[in-house]
Amino acid sequence: MAAAAALWQPQEEGLREICTLLDAHISPNSDQARIWQQLQHYSQFPDFNNYLVFLLARGEGKSFEARQAAGLLLKNNLRATFSSMPPASQQYVKSELLPCIGATNKAIRSTVGTVISVLFQIVRVAGWIELFQALHQCLDSNDLDHMEGAMDAIYKICEDVPEELDVDVPGLPERPINVFMPRLLQFFQSTHAILRKLALGCINQYIVVMPAALYMSMDQYLQGLFNLAKDPSADVRKLVCSAWVQLIEVRPSILEPHLKNVTELMLQANKDSDDEVALEACEFWSAYCDVSMPPEGLREFLPRLIPTLLSNMSYSDDDESLADAEEDESFPDRDQDLKPRFHASRLHGSETGEDDDDDDAVNVWNLRKCSAAGLDVLSNVFGDDILPTLMPLIQQNLARTDDDAWKEREAAVLSIGAIAEGCITGLYPHLPQIVAFLIPLLDDKFPLIRSITCWTLSRYSKFIVQSLEHPNGREQFDKILLGLLRRVLDTNKRVQEAACSAFATLEEEAAEELVPHLGIILQHLMCAYGKYQRRNLRILYDALGTLADAVGAELNQAKYLDIFMPPLITKWQQLANSDKDLFPLLECFTSIAQALGPGFSQFAEPVFQRCINLIQSQHLAKVDPAAAGALYDKEFIVCALDLLSGLAEGLGAGIESLVSQSSLRDILLQCCMDEAADVRQSALALLGDLSRVCPIHLHPRLQEFLNVAAKQLNPQCVKEAVSVANNACWAIGELAIKIGKEISPVVITVVSCLVPILKSPEGLNKSLLENSAITLGRLCWVCPDIVAPHMDHFMQAWCNALCMIRDDFEKEDAFHGLCAMVAANPTGAVGSLTFICQACASWNEIKSEGLHNEVCQILNGYKQMLGSGGWEQCMSTLEPAVVQRLGRYGV
């Protein structure tokens, strides 16, 4: 190829070769890997990008598809290599793109706009002044292609880097956005829909950053939005709705004077014949409520808004769910049916987050779901006040029993579920009637009515369990439980999924109330296990794991184990180490191991060894995929580590024989140093669990474990991976209790990291704050002589954190440390006495008699040290309730 020069020209042979490759590249039957390899070869030549831009800009006679392919390849190349290109080539690419802004072919114009946007992100305004001159010329022309091409390029720049047009640039009299803004607003009145759309799209990109150019033109912009609200183009109407939603989210004060008019427009747009416009408008109601606008402004619209939402909650005729709903269990799952799954790494001290209870989270967000979410939000804001409008509509829809009205009936059931939380005060007295009405719908002929009924019942699970002691409450609970189990065995895959998810929700709420029903529950779940396909098996594993979490050791009976363990073990043995269907099974076994406790020991050895093998095979795959026979996937490691933690928690010291005969210690240390945060997080959780039950087997590499864990607590690591830091902190505390003074080499390092966490402003991870306070206490307890000289740096913040921790054995450990600190240096702690008193008063009851006596000694010691006058002065600074609680310690 020719070298780049001021007057660069392509060589015919090179041009022909690249054209041939590009033609092959866009052919569906070609060997893409080979072509890509050849393109990579050509990309080594310094003027390769010159050829690509030449083809894009001047490729007359070539197919538009090949020219477009050249442009897209150029875009990717520029992103990766522009800064290292010869200056002459850089200039050539820029100069060739500008004349093509107004190309007659729309696909070429669009590709040029995309390339310009990518190149602009690299060179910015100052590096390409000529671009803005060219854009101005195109906007000033009366040629639609030129105007559209310029607007398309500006839109893509605004979309990617809007802030870059709002900068002062040497050589330009004004910021680019100041020049463009009036032109964009003028285009609101264009007779061409594409220009109105692009102009509005450009300005909408600036709502969040709000440059002065837009702020100063706000009245004109708002008036433009009002004028475009009834635009004949659905694309424009959609962007108008998007603008109102963004404005109320980030600049509600701007909308307040116009709120009534805007709300009226959005209500009308919510009924738009175009579903995308209606969807965008529907987002307004949740946004309105989320920014805490005065709800009274919306109240007058409720009688018209609620019927609109309910109407839009019916399935549209082209909803993809309608086709899916017809699939029964005989239809094999396709790969695309499997939802992406995300394993949550083990976190010590965290509350389990609630699952998204959307009835069909896998599918695309649509008007039906947005309307249901809007009704949910309105019910939480207005509570029972929406019931007089909503309930007659629901009853009217439910009364329509003809087959043609099934979508309206289904929407009515969905709405009953949507208002479960917000309207429960008004609905609770009628819960028996609601449940009595819903249960027969579990057997409706339409599968989507059966599935939504499962979801709606799950939304009331908490309240159904609360009603158990009411008259007929237990009978009601039993009917729901059996009804959902019946649907778990439905022949329709969609209903199976909804029933299984709903049953898992009921399990979480019911907990020990499930114990009398364990036999029938397990029989149904394992019957489903024999017939479910891959997608629903994942949900079934979750239901089994949730059941184990809910009933705990009650599951540890031979009559139950015989029902569910043999099928699980069979599946466990069938799945290869590289099969991703292992993930949900590993998670399920984790819950079962914790629930069964020592009862899991009969299954433990093969499960333990499989976990070790999984981690080892992934470590091999990381460095040599061919030898491992599979690609590296860290999730296998994370799930295996978490199951080992479950075994440690369930078996307790019973895991010792398994650990002693394995290489777990060395594998675990390697995982604690992994570059992936979620691997380190699970590894450190396992380190803490093993510290509790068999610290002796960590001993040979103890200092390495301590150093690795301590490293996770430095401020940068805490900032980057707070959950890893949380588990490291907890693991160090667990080790401290077991190994005592052997932890002394890292004590000062750890304390110096914990103090900033304790002193951090509110908003830091609550679990990390609590674990830091507990671990600091444990270090103080085992090494008081090392920590005591530094107590004035942390005592007050530490005591504040101790106040927030619930009563348990970990808090007891921390207070043993507090007492050890004060005993080691009573005068050093006297300046923090009021904080110590508040911490001591935070207990509801200290169960440990020894600790109670220690606290009594500390407080009485200070009372004697200060004398009656000093003590009374200290007490006068405390809340009366705190002083009253301190009376329990004899002061």
From Swiss-Prot:
Pfam families documented for this protein: HEAT, HEAT_EZ, IBN_N
Disordered as annotated region, ranges: 317-337
Gene Ontology MF terms in the entry: nuclear import signal receptor activity; nuclear localization sequence binding; small GTPase binding
Main location as per UniProt: cytoplasm
InterPro entries named in the record: ARM-like, ARM-type_fold, HEAT, Importin-beta_N, Importin_beta
Biased composition (Acidic residues): 317-330
HEAT repeats, residue ranges: 14-40, 45-83, 92-125, 131-168, 178-208, 221-248, 260-287, 303-381, 389-420, 432-459, 477-510, 518-551, 559-597, 605-653, 664-695, 703-740, 748-784, 792-825, 834-866
Compartments, as annotated in UniProt: Cytoplasm; Nucleus, Nucleoplasm
PROSITE patterns named in the record: IMPORTIN_B_NT (PS50166)
Keywords linked to the UniProt accession: Cytoplasm, Nucleus, Protein transport, Repeat, Transport
Record-annotated Importin N-terminal domain positions: 35-103
Gene Ontology cellular-component annotations: cytoplasm; nucleoplasm; nucleus
Gene3D superfamilies named in the record: Leucine-rich Repeat Variant
Top-rank taxon: Eukaryota
Function text: Functions in nuclear protein import as nuclear transport receptor. Serves as receptor for nuclear localization signals (NLS) in cargo substrates. Is thought to mediate docking of the importin/substrate complex to the nuclear pore complex (NPC) through binding to nucleoporin and the complex is subsequently translocated through the pore by an energy requiring, Ran-dependent mechanism. At the nucleoplasmic side of the NPC, Ran binds to the importin, the importin/substrate complex dissociates and importin is re-exported from the nucleus to the cytoplasm where GTP hydrolysis releases Ran.
Protein name (database record): Transportin-1
Organism for this UniProt entry: Oryza sativa subsp. japonica (Rice)
